[in-house]
């Protein structure tokens, strides 16, 4: 379960960024997670809930944006979705491809709560 170590790293960054901006509470953490990372969303969310206890992110929501796995064929130039985890070009069948997406795991944003009485 590598999700625990991933969340530990995320929480370190969240705490550092909150301190850097004098923020005492984070309301939402947005992550971009590529399909090829092997990250299990439910496990990641459960680890986040556990690791965020007692931190500036306690009670924060975790929003996950799935990044598709894309490939580009060197033979014909086609760009295609690797959702089947088939690493051959569906246009020409060539397996000389470059992965263009799907390995990302990044913090896309941190949101702070609205101040009491503030309007959106």
Curated annotation (Swiss-Prot):
Q: Where is the signal peptide?
A: none
One Gene Ontology term of the biological-process aspect is: protein maturation
Q: Which UniProt keywords apply?
A: Metal-binding, Nickel, Zinc
Listed GO MF terms: nickel cation binding; zinc ion binding
Pfam hit, one: HypA
Residues given in the record as Zn(2+) binding sites: 73, 76, 89, 92
Positions bound to Ni(2+): 2
Q: Which family does it belong to?
A: Belongs to the HypA/HybF family.
What biological function has been recorded for the protein in this entry?
A: Involved in the maturation of [NiFe] hydrogenases. Required for nickel insertion into the metal center of the hydrogenase.
Matching entries from HAMAP family are given as: HypA_HybF (MF_00213)
Q: Know the name of this protein?
A: Hydrogenase maturation factor HypA 2
